[in-house]
């Protein structure tokens, strides 16, 4: 799925649910169209300055997504192959394994390449 297909006769459906991602080959931090993903990744330093489109499956963004429901977050530099500097995240933090994730809450950030950082969450009293 590395060939250029956006704007050609090959639609995203012909890639088995994949989507065309306007992105630069040298810059993995980019924004995918909202219609083909579950997460909107908008790193501050990653401005779309693409010269050609590449196609990827619709999956979690490269630089983002501690919990799949958030926006405006970038992985720590130790995880990300590019120099992302956005560090304020809105991840789904978990107090215990039986807590339901809270997708909108006070900003917090993940430790590098690790588990979500402890945050204030609202947990269901019922079992998961």
UniProtKB/Swiss-Prot annotation:
GO CC annotations, alphabetized: cytosol; keratin filament
The protein's name in its UniProt record: Keratin-associated protein 2-4
Annotated PANTHER family: KERATIN-ASSOCIATED PROTEIN 2-1
Stretch forming the signal peptide: none
Function recorded in the entry: In the hair cortex, hair keratin intermediate filaments are embedded in an interfilamentous matrix, consisting of hair keratin-associated proteins (KRTAP), which are essential for the formation of a rigid and resistant hair shaft through their extensive disulfide bond cross-linking with abundant cysteine residues of hair keratins. The matrix proteins include the high-sulfur and high-glycine-tyrosine keratins.
Family: Belongs to the KRTAP type 2 family.
Secreted keyword on record: no
Tissue: Expressed specifically in the middle/upper portions of the hair cortex, in the region termed the keratogenous zone.
Organism, scientific name: Homo sapiens
Region annotation (10 X 5 AA repeats of C-C-[CDPQRW]-[ADPRS]-[CIPSTV]) ranges: 5-112
